[in-house]
Amino acid sequence: RLFEERYGHPMPDTLTDEVKEFRTQSITGYFDRVTSYAKLIGMENIVCVMLHTLEETSGLAGLAGIDDYGIDPYWFPGKKNNDPYDFVYEASCEAAKKAKALGKRHHIWIQGYSIPAGYEDEIVTAYDAAYDAGARTILSWSYRGGESNTYRSENCERVWQVMGEATARIRGRYFDDIRNEKLKKY
């Protein structure tokens, strides 16, 4: 009904430019309403968008009700020719740039599910890339390598171990950065 009111004809069954535009406007309008209300009652709004939905969700970061904007640059090891460092770094830089331009905080989610056996160390590479790109809130999806899900990693225990190591590594880098800044005055 809304589509027909806006465009003067029923919504087609195929994904046309009008349908894409309507979808984007609908998503943005919905988030604008709910985040504005949440802001009104004193809540903070943090949103994360998937990279493959950026066309439809790119306007969300600019909403007044959004405080923190994040992305999840999942490189899917073994399934694409994505270098995890390059892929995560470039996407994280774009998110940081967008958030900074809008005066928002940002965060990055690192893939911790559907990791094939033997690719677990790419998680460390991805954490480093996000940190090097300026992210300081870096999280992982999913708990324990997704062991209870159909999208579980092949070696969930190893994924969980590496996620902990990667987190400890960037935490150490963070505190080293603080200490090195303090040492500059001596």
Pin down the residues of each PLM region.
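Polysaccharide-binding and catalytic clefts of secreted carbohydrate-active enzymes
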Residues: 1-89, 94
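Acidic (Asp/Glu)-rich catalytic clusters
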Residues: 59-65, 93-103, 128-134
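Substrate-binding cleft of secreted/luminal carbohydrate-active enzymes
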Residues: 73, 80, 102, 106-186
